From Swiss-Prot:
Organism of this sequence: Melanoplus sanguinipes entomopoxvirus (MsEPV)
Keywords noted in UniProt: Acyltransferase, Transferase
Uppermost EC category: transferase
Domain of life of the native organism: Viruses
Functional note: Adds a myristoyl group to the N-terminal glycine residue of certain proteins.
Residue ranges the record marks as coiled coil: none
Classification via InterPro entries: Acyl_CoA_acyltransferase, NMT_N
Record's keyword annotation contains Zinc-finger: no
Enzyme Commission number(s) from the entry: 2.3.1.97
Family: Belongs to the NMT family.
Protein name, per record: Putative glycylpeptide N-tetradecanoyltransferase
Protein backbone atom coordinates (compact mmCIF):
# COMPACT_ATOMS: atom_id res chain seq x y z
CA UNK A 1 0.00 0.00 0.00
CA UNK A 2 1.23 3.50 -0.83
CA UNK A 3 2.54 5.43 2.21
CA UNK A 4 0.32 8.47 1.77
CA UNK A 5 -2.71 6.39 0.91
CA UNK A 6 -2.44 4.66 4.26
CA UNK A 7 -2.38 8.05 5.99
CA UNK A 8 -5.46 9.46 4.25
CA UNK A 9 -8.58 9.87 6.36
CA UNK A 10 -10.73 11.25 3.57
CA UNK A 11 -13.36 9.75 1.37
CA UNK A 12 -14.57 11.34 -1.84
CA UNK A 13 -17.80 10.69 -3.65
CA UNK A 14 -19.51 12.42 -6.56
CA UNK A 15 -23.07 13.69 -6.26
CA UNK A 16 -24.64 15.20 -9.36
CA UNK A 17 -21.61 16.75 -11.03
CA UNK A 18 -20.02 18.14 -7.91
CA UNK A 19 -17.38 16.47 -5.80
CA UNK A 20 -18.18 16.59 -2.12
CA UNK A 21 -15.46 16.07 0.44
CA UNK A 22 -16.28 14.01 3.49
CA UNK A 23 -13.57 13.80 6.13
CA UNK A 24 -13.79 11.04 8.71
CA UNK A 25 -11.36 9.68 11.24
CA UNK A 26 -9.94 6.44 9.87
CA UNK A 27 -6.49 5.93 11.44
CA UNK A 28 -4.36 3.32 9.74
CA UNK A 29 -1.23 1.83 11.28
CA UNK A 30 1.99 2.77 9.54
CA UNK A 31 2.99 0.58 6.63
CA UNK A 32 6.61 1.59 7.19
CA UNK A 33 8.63 -0.85 9.29
CA UNK A 34 10.98 1.37 11.28
CA UNK A 35 13.17 -1.60 12.17
CA UNK A 36 14.38 -1.60 8.56
CA UNK A 37 16.25 1.64 9.30
CA UNK A 38 17.98 0.66 12.55
CA UNK A 39 21.36 0.88 10.78
CA UNK A 40 20.91 4.66 10.54
CA UNK A 41 21.53 7.20 13.27
CA UNK A 42 19.31 10.20 13.99
CA UNK A 43 21.10 13.51 14.54
CA UNK A 44 20.08 17.15 14.69
CA UNK A 45 21.24 20.33 13.00
CA UNK A 46 23.33 22.87 14.89
CA UNK A 47 26.05 25.44 14.35
CA UNK A 48 28.58 22.60 14.48
CA UNK A 49 27.28 20.68 11.46
CA UNK A 50 25.25 23.27 9.53
CA UNK A 51 27.98 23.85 6.90
CA UNK A 52 28.15 20.17 5.94
CA UNK A 53 24.35 19.92 5.90
CA UNK A 54 24.07 22.96 3.62
CA UNK A 55 26.56 21.35 1.21
CA UNK A 56 24.52 18.13 1.28
CA UNK A 57 21.24 19.91 0.51
CA UNK A 58 22.84 21.91 -2.31
CA UNK A 59 24.30 18.75 -3.84
CA UNK A 60 21.10 16.71 -3.75
CA UNK A 61 18.43 19.33 -4.53
CA UNK A 62 17.66 21.75 -7.35
CA UNK A 63 18.42 24.93 -5.42
CA UNK A 64 21.67 26.41 -4.16
CA UNK A 65 21.76 28.11 -0.74
CA UNK A 66 24.57 30.15 0.70
CA UNK A 67 25.40 29.17 4.26
CA UNK A 68 24.08 32.38 5.82
CA UNK A 69 20.63 32.03 4.21
CA UNK A 70 20.47 28.32 5.02
CA UNK A 71 21.38 28.92 8.67
CA UNK A 72 18.84 31.74 8.91
CA UNK A 73 16.07 29.42 7.71
CA UNK A 74 17.01 26.31 9.66
CA UNK A 75 18.38 27.68 12.93
CA UNK A 76 15.57 30.18 13.43
CA UNK A 77 14.67 31.12 17.03
CA UNK A 78 11.08 29.84 16.82
CA UNK A 79 11.58 26.13 16.11
CA UNK A 80 12.73 23.37 18.43
CA UNK A 81 16.11 21.76 17.58
CA UNK A 82 14.41 18.35 17.48
CA UNK A 83 12.47 19.50 14.40
CA UNK A 84 15.67 19.65 12.29
CA UNK A 85 16.68 16.05 11.62
CA UNK A 86 19.79 14.61 9.98
CA UNK A 87 20.00 10.91 9.14
CA UNK A 88 23.46 9.33 9.16
CA UNK A 89 24.82 6.08 7.76
CA UNK A 90 27.87 5.83 10.03
CA UNK A 91 29.33 9.35 9.57
CA UNK A 92 27.76 9.96 6.16
CA UNK A 93 24.74 12.26 5.81
CA UNK A 94 22.06 10.41 3.83
CA UNK A 95 18.91 12.48 4.47
CA UNK A 96 17.62 15.68 6.04
CA UNK A 97 14.28 17.21 6.98
CA UNK A 98 13.48 20.56 8.60
CA UNK A 99 10.30 21.49 10.45
CA UNK A 100 9.65 25.21 10.99
CA UNK A 101 7.19 25.93 13.79
CA UNK A 102 4.36 28.22 12.70
CA UNK A 103 0.81 29.13 13.63
CA UNK A 104 -2.06 28.84 11.17
CA UNK A 105 -5.64 30.09 11.14
CA UNK A 106 -8.48 28.01 9.78
CA UNK A 107 -12.07 29.01 10.51
CA UNK A 108 -10.96 31.70 12.99
CA UNK A 109 -9.09 29.20 15.16
CA UNK A 110 -5.31 29.12 15.55
CA UNK A 111 -3.27 25.91 15.61
CA UNK A 112 0.45 25.29 15.99
CA UNK A 113 1.84 23.50 12.97
CA UNK A 114 5.09 22.08 11.63
CA UNK A 115 5.92 23.41 8.16
CA UNK A 116 8.16 20.73 6.65
CA UNK A 117 10.91 21.64 4.19
CA UNK A 118 14.43 20.60 3.11
CA UNK A 119 13.35 16.97 2.77
CA UNK A 120 16.46 15.75 0.96
CA UNK A 121 17.74 12.22 0.38
CA UNK A 122 21.06 11.16 -1.14
CA UNK A 123 20.49 9.80 -4.65
CA UNK A 124 22.16 6.51 -3.69
CA UNK A 125 19.69 5.99 -0.82
CA UNK A 126 16.44 6.77 -2.59
CA UNK A 127 13.57 4.34 -3.29
CA UNK A 128 14.11 2.79 0.15
CA UNK A 129 11.38 4.66 2.01
CA UNK A 130 13.89 6.77 3.94
CA UNK A 131 11.94 9.99 3.28
CA UNK A 132 8.83 8.44 4.86
CA UNK A 133 10.88 7.28 7.83
CA UNK A 134 12.24 10.74 8.65
CA UNK A 135 8.82 12.33 8.12
CA UNK A 136 7.52 9.94 10.79
CA UNK A 137 10.41 10.83 13.09
CA UNK A 138 9.84 14.56 12.65
CA UNK A 139 6.15 14.28 13.47
CA UNK A 140 6.84 12.08 16.48
CA UNK A 141 9.13 14.82 17.81
CA UNK A 142 6.49 17.44 17.06
CA UNK A 143 3.85 15.38 18.85
CA UNK A 144 6.11 15.16 21.91
CA UNK A 145 6.25 18.98 21.91
CA UNK A 146 2.45 19.27 21.75
CA UNK A 147 2.18 20.02 18.02
CA UNK A 148 -0.59 18.01 16.35
CA UNK A 149 -0.40 19.22 12.76
CA UNK A 150 2.08 19.24 9.90
CA UNK A 151 1.90 20.90 6.50
CA UNK A 152 3.82 20.76 3.25
CA UNK A 153 3.39 22.12 -0.25
CA UNK A 154 4.30 20.57 -3.57
CA UNK A 155 4.10 21.46 -7.23
CA UNK A 156 2.70 18.02 -8.04
CA UNK A 157 -0.52 16.52 -6.80
CA UNK A 158 0.02 13.21 -5.01
CA UNK A 159 -2.19 10.79 -6.88
CA UNK A 160 -2.51 8.20 -4.15
CA UNK A 161 -4.09 10.62 -1.68
CA UNK A 162 -7.84 10.21 -1.81
CA UNK A 163 -8.63 13.84 -1.13
CA UNK A 164 -6.67 17.04 -0.71
CA UNK A 165 -7.40 20.70 -0.20
CA UNK A 166 -5.84 23.16 -2.62
CA UNK A 167 -5.47 26.35 -0.61
CA UNK A 168 -3.93 29.75 -1.16
CA UNK A 169 -1.77 30.70 1.79
CA UNK A 170 -1.29 34.17 3.25
CA UNK A 171 0.07 35.84 6.35
CA UNK A 172 -1.89 37.96 8.78
CA UNK A 173 -0.66 39.62 11.93
CA UNK A 174 -1.61 37.90 15.16
CA UNK A 175 -4.59 39.19 17.09
CA UNK A 176 -5.15 37.18 20.26
CA UNK A 177 -8.42 38.97 20.96
CA UNK A 178 -9.91 38.06 17.59
CA UNK A 179 -8.79 34.44 17.26
CA UNK A 180 -8.54 31.66 19.81
CA UNK A 181 -5.68 29.19 19.94
CA UNK A 182 -6.44 25.48 20.13
CA UNK A 183 -3.54 23.05 20.26
CA UNK A 184 -5.37 20.15 21.90
CA UNK A 185 -7.57 18.92 19.06
CA UNK A 186 -8.11 19.61 15.39
CA UNK A 187 -11.58 19.35 13.88
CA UNK A 188 -10.97 17.61 10.55
CA UNK A 189 -14.38 18.80 9.30
CA UNK A 190 -12.87 22.28 8.93
CA UNK A 191 -11.20 21.05 5.77
CA UNK A 192 -14.45 20.05 4.10
CA UNK A 193 -14.63 23.35 2.21
CA UNK A 194 -12.00 23.44 -0.50
CA UNK A 195 -12.23 27.21 -0.95
CA UNK A 196 -11.19 28.00 2.62
CA UNK A 197 -7.89 29.88 2.59
CA UNK A 198 -5.07 29.09 4.97
CA UNK A 199 -3.48 31.90 6.95
CA UNK A 200 -0.13 31.91 8.73
CA UNK A 201 -0.36 33.94 11.94
CA UNK A 202 2.77 35.93 12.79
CA UNK A 203 3.54 38.17 15.75
CA UNK A 204 5.75 41.26 15.52
CA UNK A 205 8.94 39.34 16.29
CA UNK A 206 8.22 36.74 13.61
CA UNK A 207 7.41 39.36 10.99
CA UNK A 208 10.65 41.19 11.77
CA UNK A 209 12.62 37.95 11.49
CA UNK A 210 11.10 36.46 8.33
CA UNK A 211 10.81 39.71 6.35
CA UNK A 212 14.56 40.25 6.41
CA UNK A 213 15.95 42.22 3.46
CA UNK A 214 19.35 40.60 3.87
CA UNK A 215 17.93 37.26 2.76
CA UNK A 216 14.76 38.29 0.96
CA UNK A 217 13.51 40.56 -1.77
CA UNK A 218 10.58 42.53 -0.36
CA UNK A 219 7.79 44.02 -2.48
CA UNK A 220 5.19 46.29 -0.90
CA UNK A 221 1.86 47.07 -2.59
CA UNK A 222 -1.02 48.74 -0.77
CA UNK A 223 0.77 48.10 2.54
CA UNK A 224 0.92 44.39 1.77
CA UNK A 225 4.34 42.74 1.94
CA UNK A 226 5.57 39.96 -0.34
CA UNK A 227 8.75 38.23 0.73
CA UNK A 228 10.83 36.43 -1.92
CA UNK A 229 13.74 34.30 -0.79
CA UNK A 230 16.94 35.11 -2.68
CA UNK A 231 18.21 31.85 -4.08
CA UNK A 232 20.02 30.27 -7.04
CA UNK A 233 18.89 27.44 -9.27
CA UNK A 234 21.21 24.67 -10.45
CA UNK A 235 21.47 26.34 -13.87
CA UNK A 236 23.01 29.34 -12.04
CA UNK A 237 20.01 31.52 -12.77
CA UNK A 238 19.12 33.74 -9.85
CA UNK A 239 15.58 33.22 -8.62
CA UNK A 240 13.36 34.68 -5.96
CA UNK A 241 10.86 32.25 -4.44
CA UNK A 242 7.85 33.63 -2.61
CA UNK A 243 7.95 32.28 0.94
CA UNK A 244 5.82 34.77 2.87
CA UNK A 245 2.93 37.15 2.29
CA UNK A 246 1.59 39.70 4.77
CA UNK A 247 -1.89 40.65 3.58
CA UNK A 248 -2.81 43.92 5.25
CA UNK A 249 -5.99 44.78 3.33
CA UNK A 250 -8.38 43.32 0.79
CA UNK A 251 -7.22 45.50 -2.11
CA UNK A 252 -4.53 42.95 -2.80
CA UNK A 253 -6.89 40.33 -4.24
CA UNK A 254 -5.86 40.81 -7.85
CA UNK A 255 -2.21 40.40 -6.87
CA UNK A 256 -2.62 37.40 -4.59
CA UNK A 257 -0.35 34.52 -5.54
CA UNK A 258 0.43 31.21 -3.83
CA UNK A 259 3.54 30.70 -1.73
CA UNK A 260 6.45 28.96 -3.48
CA UNK A 261 5.80 30.90 -6.69
CA UNK A 262 8.94 31.78 -8.62
CA UNK A 263 9.95 35.30 -9.61
CA UNK A 264 12.96 35.63 -11.90
CA UNK A 265 15.53 38.06 -10.58
CA UNK A 266 15.25 40.55 -13.44
CA UNK A 267 11.61 41.30 -12.60
CA UNK A 268 10.87 43.95 -10.01
CA UNK A 269 7.13 44.49 -10.42
CA UNK A 270 4.67 42.09 -8.84
CA UNK A 271 2.36 41.72 -11.89
CA UNK A 272 5.36 40.35 -13.83
CA UNK A 273 5.74 37.34 -11.56
CA UNK A 274 5.69 34.06 -13.42
CA UNK A 275 3.91 31.25 -11.61
CA UNK A 276 5.55 27.88 -12.05
CA UNK A 277 2.47 25.83 -11.15
CA UNK A 278 -0.45 25.68 -8.80
CA UNK A 279 0.65 24.86 -5.28
CA UNK A 280 -0.99 21.91 -3.54
CA UNK A 281 -1.06 22.30 0.23
CA UNK A 282 -1.33 19.14 2.29
CA UNK A 283 -2.29 19.24 5.96
CA UNK A 284 -1.79 16.13 8.02
CA UNK A 285 -2.75 15.38 11.61
CA UNK A 286 -1.34 13.20 14.34
CA UNK A 287 -4.60 11.60 15.40
CA UNK A 288 -3.55 8.64 17.49
CA UNK A 289 -2.68 7.52 21.00
CA UNK A 290 0.18 5.21 20.07
CA UNK A 291 3.05 6.95 18.29
CA UNK A 292 3.68 3.81 16.23
CA UNK A 293 0.42 4.55 14.42
CA UNK A 294 2.14 7.54 12.83
CA UNK A 295 0.54 10.19 10.66
CA UNK A 296 -3.05 10.35 9.50
CA UNK A 297 -3.45 12.35 6.33
CA UNK A 298 -6.14 14.84 5.42
Amino acid sequence: MNYWESKSICTVFTKYNDTEIINKIDPVKSNIDHSLYKQYTIGYMSNFNIVNICKFVNKHSNYIFDIDTFSWLVLNPFSDPSFNIVLYDNDKIVATIVGILRSIKIKNEIHKIIHTTFLTVDENYRKQGIHFYIIDKLMENAFNKGVLLGIFSTMKKIKKIKCVNVQDTYIIKSDSKKYKENNNVFDYKKLNQKNDDLYFIYNDMEIEYWFNKKYCHIISIYNNLFCFLKIKYKNNENLNILIEQYIHNKNINKYSIPNNSIMFSQYIQLPQIKLQNQIYTYIYNLNFNNLKCNICMF
